[in-house]
Amino acid sequence: MAKEELLEMEGLVDEILPDSRYRITLDNGHKLIAYTAGRVKKNHIRILAGDKVSLEVSPYDLSKGRITFRHIDKKQSFAGAPYRRH
């Protein structure tokens, strides 16, 4: 399948499921299950319930998607030192 055929959508994370999967509600109200893209896993980007994310969805199966980007909430302020991995 070529990348041109994928649909780009945005949604909100409702629930975190086992095996790095998430239940997402799209902006149009449709619900689906999504997993994180390799780029997101590689960069250790944490996705929590309530986060706004961008997804790629195949036009052949609209019940599954891949999370490609987590949008940053401007209202959050990080007080103190940045998160460090040990």
Swiss-Prot record:
Transmembrane segments: none annotated. Keywords: Cytoplasm, Initiation factor, Protein biosynthesis, RNA-binding, rRNA-binding. GO terms for cellular component: cytosol. Residues 1-72 form the S1-like domain. Signal peptide: none annotated. It comes from the Bacteria. It is found in: Cytoplasm. Its main location: cytoplasm. One of its GO terms (molecular function) is translation initiation factor activity. Component of the 30S ribosomal translation pre-initiation complex which assembles on the 30S ribosome in the order IF-2 and IF-3, IF-1 and N-formylmethionyl-tRNA(fMet); mRNA recruitment can occur at any time during PIC assembly. HAMAP family: IF_1 (MF_00075). NCBIfam families: infA. PANTHER family: TRANSLATION INITIATION FACTOR IF-1, CHLOROPLASTIC. One of the essential components for the initiation of protein synthesis. Stabilizes the binding of IF-2 and IF-3 on the 30S subunit to which N-formylmethionyl-tRNA(fMet) subsequently binds. Helps modulate mRNA selection, yielding the 30S pre-initiation complex (PIC). Upon addition of the 50S ribosomal subunit IF-1, IF-2 and IF-3 are released leaving the mature 70S translation initiation complex. Belongs to the IF-1 family. This is Translation initiation factor IF-1 2. The lineage of its organism: Bacteria, Pseudomonadati, Pseudomonadota, Betaproteobacteria, Burkholderiales.
